[in-house]
Amino acid sequence: HIQNLRYIQGGVNMTEKILKNNQAVVAGEIISDFEFSHEVFGEGFYFVKLRVNRLSHSSDTIPLLVSERLIDVTHSHIGQYLEAHGQFRSYNKHENNKNHLVLSLFVRELEFIDSMENRKPNMIFLDGYICKEPVYRTTPLGREIADVLLAVNRAYGKSDYIPCICWGRNARYAGNLSVGSRIQLWGRIQSREYQKRVGENNV
């Protein structure tokens, strides 16, 4: 969910931008146990779910990908509060002959906290390139919205593909941008739970 965005001209210095072009911080309550994801050179990485409250009293469930070297993954931490800093990442998971884009926050630093007081629980900054024609539309209630797929460069020639949503004047602005445009955006990470209609009577 994008709150502010900016169009950038010119190239990007990869050595300076590898970490700076994708920054996120979330704070909330752990609501799951750890689920093994993968191992790199003997270091295990695990998924855990964090519930992050919005100002509107609803909440988002954000998957964290965390190293066993940052937290004791053999114990349950359900009900504890955590602040995590890292990068929002994506990968394609092949399941039932379909590709599914999996999004998670790759945690670089974390801290257990006593409460959410004076915390800004959900912020993200991305600097990347539009890799699909933006889709601008109006909702049935008259709200302007634009879908943007952003490619954010990572080290070793990899990229993360992050679907973003803009509202209002940001939606109008983003709807006129072309593929290959470099933009910077500030916003929040949002879980997208929706019902998809697959037939006349089925959702």
Residue ranges and their predicted role:
Residues 4-203:
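Single-stranded nucleic acid-binding surfaces, predominantly the OB-fold ssDNA-binding core
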